[in-house]
């Protein structure tokens, strides 16, 4: 009886031009295999089993065997029975019945055949049956198994654990366990398939029970009475695989697939392409767990994972955890409930990324899951010392009342927009958080980058960041509001945590007074205001006779304002006046303002485009607002007593004294910042800083646009120099993470406000013409660009000027954008210049000609006459002597020089010996290089083979 290790398939050999037999696991020519491992062959027969169980011998316990026709009966009279078998196969027409004293009785069957076990017929048991064969076990198509509980394993059970709650299985069996049939356990029963490689391609059912697929060399099953409650892989071998391509149903119960031990450094894979259902049944929620090694394991999530509650009750729980977890775009993951609460899906790998391509899950797949499931993405550094970051690089949106939780031991980086419109939809962001048994990094943070915004527009959405619950603001509020639930109403709780759930139109403030949030030192804002990338538009604050004026009047040391933009703001006051804050002792980051700031009184002090008086920290922020004031007037800050870093101002600035393009009076620190706006004043004016009693480092102003040749601090540059990366790079500016610049077009721009845009050059293929190539074939954008994309596309790279056949790089360029536009990422294309057509004739055919009138070859052949390195012929030469062409050999290039406009080759055969390229030259112009491998065979070959 041949084993499955000896099953072969026929594939075409391109080397031998024939069909050859290869092992079943061998790959044909085609795409390389991915990370998913192929199922190893089970060492059992592919043919029909030839016999029922034979050679049964009772080792312990009491029982007997009998056979009548095609039915074998094992009658068990003790609670535990151990049998040894010489062979245990069930043919398609055969039945094996285990008659046991109770549902809790166990019959252990150790099989000592030299091949694997085949179950192709019927196996029935009212109790629990263990089949153990180190050479493998196959439940073939058509197999029907009905048991109270079953273990099919290539690992042997340790006898002393058999009666306890934890049962250990160990062994060196090399076979696999594969199910292609139907295995059904009684309600509350279980099915466990154990071995180094385990696969279900059939159907397994265990309602209210458990299905466990474990791949490893040591496995522990844990029981509560007769119920299987846990599977743990204790030891691994290389390339352990647990796979499901069929159907597993355990409604109201548990499904667990695990490969490799948790801390093993050996590769292991859990792969689901089939359907796994553990839906709520009789108010019992189901659980599905796909678990790979947390050091080197891989879980591939495809197909369907369904722990929903379609018929009542709450949804269940799904976990997919390993060092690496990859979710297919078409995977269906749900814990939805029609009449109860949605369940949860936990994804727990290292360094997880949401991306349209090249990541671990796409935004579309995550959005689909959130339609009915609470999703928790969890990232840790792991044993390989990854970053521990969780990155959202693709748009995520959902309308259900579900919650997305983002937890990382280091940073949570949101680089693409997240939108939740459900009335009670939620978002939880936990950076710097211990998870998966790993401590927090201690430095992790939440970062909103790349122009991304987080929208929570429902009636009562939820938001938590770093353990703090935020009130989500989606409305302006009435004048004088203190509700604590709208923008104006923040005055009702100045120490709270607030977030903008959407953009707010504040046009109504043009006709009603807006009271600054935290109106003075006695009542400062001491909480956190998280803009989530949103804007407040058309805000008017008219406090002509007041000081400490801005959206926030006075910000305390503990106050934090970040990720917000003020668009079209109109602010008026007498002193300590700014669009975002009048006075700030707190931290302001990733924020900006456009509009006008007007210090109306002649004696107004500290007027700035973003902040009037800064005693705290301003990072990664800018202002384009026009600013007018009296003493201490600056494009970004009027009076700086704290720190300004990685910031800039471009608006015009007009004041009386201490007037600067960035800062009016500096008493603190300014670094890595610049100004380009025009500056005018009566006394003490500067292009960057008006008065300086602090320090100014690596900061610049535009001497042309500011109309100022001097400044109390900083370095003056021309407009051309301001638009060149070189000087800023020498000053230590970070163009990899903080800044970008479009050389010759813009001054430095802050990356955090810009949306990545991939611009890809299209490939080009042209036939050889002897003329240099120029230009390109257009570009493709990763998103629909708008008016923010400026410039004209240009092309560079080795393609420009290319003549000879070959592949050349097309490098696009020429586009640029402003601050709220695009961070352009170019992807090159390829120019392929193909050789002019060359006909290599292996049998009589129509004459081929060389047409030098167009400096190209319509069809031709390369030849060399015997004894010479080249051939020049007279008028209209015709070569009909095939043997002459057998001399096309030699270590260097051979050349054929036709002497007229037409040279015909008839019935030619080419010998492909030699090493150099063969050249065709016409009138001194090199027309083509023909590889010596271009000869075509006389007989056809399969289409899957490469042309030779």
Task: Describe the residue ranges of each PLM region.
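Extracellular and secretory-pathway beta-repeat/beta-biased strand scaffolds
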Residues: 5, 18-23, 27-470, 481-493, ...
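Hydrophobic beta-strand positions
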Residues: 11-12, 131
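Surface-exposed repetitive/solenoidal architectures
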Residues: 351-767, 772, 821-827, 832-848, ...
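Residue-level recognition of short loop/turn positions
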Residues: 15-16, 208, 533, 821
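Extracellular acidic, Ser/Thr/Pro-rich low-complexity tracts
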Residues: 780-785
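An N-terminal, helix-rich hydrophobic module
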Residues: 5-6, 12-13
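A short beta-strand segment in extracellular, disulfide-stabilized domains
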Residues: 772-779, 810-811
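Serine/threonine-rich, repeat-prone extracellular segments and beta-strand-based repeat modules
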Residues: 786-821, 825-831
